[in-house]
């Protein structure tokens, strides 16, 4: 659901991006959703939140990108292929009472996607040792489960040196030095 005020503004600013399109899996989406999804690929590949903004700055008009005419589109298509392969990686889900956990070592920022793909009725935490020095984790909670992801992750603050984290009821994230990762 798009908030009505935001939808009205989007329809006025770029109506062609508010038109329905078929997604790669056959589901319907708005053109803007596909555009935003592609822009987010840069962050997943390079770990920096600034990457999507740099990509946006390099595009003179959204039409070039949405119509697949911009050279950046081809690069993002390659990113998408690599990420699809990573999203399908074999994982082992460990069950720890109320929370499931997956441990991976991957240079890409895919924890949140793996949470969504493997969540099965209870909260799931994916911890990714993405280089020799750092671990980043993502916790997701099903909508129908009463569990506060942010409060759960806050319980680890001060117990693991260098851990930073937080979140809200349905999602949260943590990072900590890899030497703390057992």
Give the location of each predicted region:
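A structured phosphate/pyrophosphate-recognition subdomain
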Residues: 1-98, 103-109, 115-130
